[in-house]
Regions:
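A short macromolecule-binding patch
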Residues: 202-213, 242-243
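OB-fold/S1-family single-stranded nucleic acid-binding modules
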Residues: 233-263
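Domain-level signal for Mg2+-assisted phosphodiester chemistry and nucleotide/NA-binding surfaces
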Residues: 1-90, 94, 119, 134, ...
Length: 266
């Protein structure tokens, strides 16, 4: 199986994926086949680089790290404009470059992992599928519904172990007892529910029980909600586990304040 990865880095950064680990992403897709193309499309402020040497060194250092993991980095210079109010606005849209290269390089690929939530890629996904390419979307928050519906499969980036590191936790502690992991809700009952989360090996899914008392305040749980939680031994089921200290990461709706309308997150 020949695999390609195409990352809309700016979209991912602005949509909950700031700080993703490129080495983890490479290792994740490698279990399904050979990663032939690994492309990341990033924006850089070339004007700032000419005067801010700390920013320049930091940017070059980051790009070098990403390249060391086997990724080709395609940079797009930020162009600055003034809006009608005189405010300075920067734009660096790499969507066209990314779309063209996906179409050109797809003839050598079987599956493409597309990291973006941008609905502008809907037609590109359709074109790739018409060429016999499987397209899987990985994103965090603010995913276009149209893009979601076109994908052959969607996986929240939060669910890939350590793709986005858990705060103040070693990578090897993901899913260990009394440590944190992330999972999605697949069953809601009267006062309790169940989630699935990927084990540290990134291959096997595990089930975990949760009680509504562990939900964030004022959150009404929905199917497919994504949570970060602590894994603890169940006091009732021998060998069982339960989720505590649950934190919502991605949800369809939050319970509104009085007088507010429900606010969709996706």
């Amino acid at each position: 199986m020949k695999i390609g990865v195409f990352i809309d880095a700016e979209n991912i950064r602005r949509s909950g994926g700031y700080g993703i680990r490129y080495d983890v992403l490479r290792d994740y897709v490698s279990q399904f086949g050979d990663p032939i193309r690994l492309n990341s499309y990033m924006s850089v402020d070339e004007a700032r680089m000419r005067t801010d040497y700390e920013y320049k060194d930091r940017t070059h250092g980051f790009l070098s790290i990403v390249r060391s993991y086997g990724f080709k980095v395609i940079t797009k210079a930020i162009r600055w404009f003034e809006d009608e109010d005189g405010q300075r606005i920067g734009k660096a849209n790499a969507d066209l470059d990314m779309a063209v290269e996906m179409l050109l390089q797809s003839q050598h690929l079987d599956t493409i992992y597309l990291l973006t939530g941008d609905g502008d890629f809907k037609r590109v996904v359709q074109a790739l599928q018409n060429m016999g390419i499987r397209v899987e979307i990985v994103a965090f928050r603010y995913i276009s519904r149209e893009l979601l519906h076109e994908a052959d499969q969607f996986l929240s980036g939060y669910l890939i172990p350590n793709l986005l590191p858990v705060l103040d936790q070693r990578a090897e502690d993901w899913g260990a007892m009394s440590c944190r992991a992330r999972g999605y809700c697949y069953s809601v009952q009267d006062g309790y529910g169940f989630m699935k989360y990927l084990d540290i090996d990134m291959r096997s899914w595990r089930d975990i029980f949760f009680h509504f008392s562990q939900l964030p305040e004022r959150h009404y749980v929905n199917l497919d909600d994504v949570f970060e939680f602590t894994i603890e031994p169940s006091p009732r089921a021998e060998g069982g586990i339960l989720a505590t200290h649950m934190q919502i990461l991605h949800s369809r709706h939050f319970i509104p304040d009085k007088g507010e309308k429900p606010t969709p997150v996706v």
